[in-house]
């Protein structure tokens, strides 16, 4: 099943780091900034963002 993601946050982007998919402020992967972003959800077309759980 693909991830149904909503609530796009333009300040954040999905990044692959250390094998993990995280959502971080663009240009910044600091730990304290990751939680400021929505969840990073993967789906067949790429990545989107969700303020709720990836489904």
From Swiss-Prot:
Location in the cell: Secreted
InterPro entries reported for this sequence: Kazal_dom (IPR002350), Kazal_dom_sf (IPR036058)
Top-rank taxon: Eukaryota
One GO cellular component term noted in the UniProt record for this chain: extracellular region
Site for Reactive bond, residues: 16-17
Keywords: Disulfide bond, Protease inhibitor, Secreted, Serine protease inhibitor
Kazal-like domain segment(s): 1-55
Segments crossing the lipid bilayer: none
A GO MF label: serine-type endopeptidase inhibitor activity
Disulfide bonds: 5-40, 12-41, 14-37, 23-54
Job of this protein: Potent inhibitor of trypsin.
Protein's recorded name: Trypsin inhibitor
Organism: Halocynthia roretzi
């Amino acid at each position: 099943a693909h991830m149904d993601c909503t609530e796009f946050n333009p300040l954040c982007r999905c990044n692959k780091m250390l094998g993990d998919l995280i959502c971080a402020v663009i240009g910044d992967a600091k730990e304290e900034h990751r939680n400021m972003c929505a969840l990073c959800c993967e789906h067949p077309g790429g990545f989107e963002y969700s303020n709720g759980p990836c489904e």
